[in-house]
Swiss-Prot record:
Zn(2+) binds at Q258, H261, D359, H418. This is Histidinol dehydrogenase. It catalyses: L-histidinol + 2 NAD(+) + H2O = L-histidine + 2 NADH + 3 H(+). It comes from Legionella pneumophila (strain Paris). The gene is hisD. Binds 1 zinc ion per subunit. Belongs to the histidinol dehydrogenase family. NAD(+) binds at Y124, Q187, N210. Pfam families: Histidinol_dh. Substrate binds at S236, Q258, H261, H326, D359, E413, H418. Catalyzes the sequential NAD-dependent oxidations of L-histidinol to L-histidinaldehyde and then to L-histidine. The active site is at E325, H326. It comes from the Bacteria. Its cofactor is Zn(2+). One of its GO terms (cellular component) is cytosol.
Amino acid sequence: MLTIKNWQLLSDNDKRRCLSRPRDNSAIKENVLEIINQVQLSGDKALYDLTKRFDRVNLQYLQISQEKIRQASIPQNALIAIKQAIETISSYHQFLLPENTEISTASGITIRNVYRPIQKVGLYVPGGNKTPLVSSLLMQAIPAKVAGCPIKVLCTPPDAEGEINEHILVAARLCGIDTIYAIGGAQAIAAMAYGTESVIKVDKIFGPGNSYVTQAKTLVAIDADGAAIDMPAGPSEVMILADTEANPEFIAADLLAQAEHGPDSQVILICDECELANQVNQQLEIQMSYLSRIEFIKQSLTNSRIIICSNQSEQLDIINSYAPEHLIINRKNPEPWVEKIVAAGTVFLGSWAAETMGDYVTGSNHVLPTSGFARNHSGLSTLDFMTRFTVQAINQEAIRNLGPAAMTLAELEGLDAHANAVQIRLNTLGD
């Protein structure tokens, strides 16, 4: 079960270790670079070869036909659930859609903010046939659709027969995606970043993945010929702040829900007293007995812990220092805490706010910054699928009134051609 640490008894070094995250020490950068180079050099052939090597699949084709997308069908209960999720996710991301605005900063000057959809976006959904991560697709495809991105490309790993799970195909169809490739891993990221004979080169790549996918996204993002990415990615995590009135059964369930993501996931509980910590550990043992992903959970819990800390100021310091992907405030009166949180991917308030709901159906996006990146990154939103540029209108009055200031600043920086561009206009205006 989870190790229990008393915060007040820890040294500063022990406190840092207590909040440290599991690290992937595998040296994969060179392997990923090799994959990227192979895709750049050999295009489609590399994709077929790499899929055979990593997925053990002899693909007959890379792109899923329009007929297969149209004919895909799933059980009615799954279809209803997907449509319900689409409705809430669409509502929230429509709410985030920005409006073009205009301001006059001085007499004769107006500046407009103009938003445009990114023209070509690449969506990556990991998992393959056994675990169709429909929610991951919805969280990317819906804001892309709301933003108005005209070209949306989906890459996801094939099953043993080289096909895509029909739940993914149906969800993609409902979200208006008709360009789907049966490609996974780092090779999928490389294909979308650089393009091949079959795969469209995109402007920005979205979506989670394993360490190879994450490394590939990082590498293509720093290449001027590659593609931008949504955000740095890492293992899933949750931090729960609970008081003595919190239900230990609920707490344990939320911890396990995050732990089952993978062996490198991390869960941390902050609570006031040791009694609740022990009750949660008991519940973890009970609930683990009937869950299916037990090996992932066991490994994840070795990276995780319970922190006993009753000082509210210190509790806030822990939260803001850790900057969790998911924060659950399971306290009697959670709302006042929100004003003091400065770093979190998303915050759930109260006993009934199961993190699972946010993963699927509240409408908020579940693609969130991990590994402490919530200090300087936000969760995925409609804005991530858009660009903004300014439109500046400047008339004669503005040149006359502010031109001399612009010239002075240009000359201060030794840029006489800058100053000249204004002086010529002032000369034309005369006195």
